[in-house]
């Protein structure tokens, strides 16, 4: 239902994963790349651009996927823009997270305060926005709201497989105990 719902104006603080609309101007001079993602044979990353707002801290916007190599043109709108997407509450680096390279503006964990400092914006919003939209150029935005993983079939196969194996072990044990010596 929320997928087809209209985006609402950004409230401060916003609810995580809420579909919102926000206005401002992109600061393309302070872009960075987030993560690594392979699409087909092409390695790419997500383009993160600060959105400057009047009277409010900048918001880091994940505008979508871009290839790391090649010279395909990436859209960089000038002037005022209105962006729709979902609120990304930010992540904290884990024990096995890759180390960010602030000098190269390469980030592997979406931590808005840390990314903001690395991009020269010490006062960014503690959340970000992931742009939603149709494919049709670069950057290639997300098309759906995030969904939790659904591993139910895998769990069913695992647990029924273990139960079947246990029945087999018990049958072998009972057969051996029941044989005369």
Indicate where each model-derived feature is located.
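Surface-exposed, charge/polar-rich loops and edge strands
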Residues: 1-181
């Amino acid at each position: 239902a929320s997928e087809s719902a209209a985006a609402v104006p950004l409230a401060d603080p916003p609810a995580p994963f809420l579909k919102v609309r926000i206005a401002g101007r992109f600061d393309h001079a302070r872009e960075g790349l987030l993560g690594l993602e392979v699409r087909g044979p092409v390695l790419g990353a997500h383009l993160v651009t600060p959105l400057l707002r009047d009277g409010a801290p900048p918001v880091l916007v994940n505008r979508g996927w871009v290839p790391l190599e090649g010279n395909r043109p990436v859209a960089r709108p000038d002037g005022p823009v209105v962006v729709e997407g979902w609120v990304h509450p930010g992540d904290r680096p884990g024990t096995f997270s890759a180390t960010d390279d602030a000098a190269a503006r390469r980030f592997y964990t979406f931590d808005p305060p840390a990314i903001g400092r690395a991009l020269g914006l010490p006062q960014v919003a503690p959340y970000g926005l992931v742009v939603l939209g149709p494919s049709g150029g670069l950057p290639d935005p997300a098309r759906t709201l995030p969904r939790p993983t659904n591993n139910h079939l895998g769990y069913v196969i695992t647990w029924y497989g273990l139960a079947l194996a246990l029945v087999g072990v018990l049958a072998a044990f009972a057969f051996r105990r029941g044989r005369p010596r």
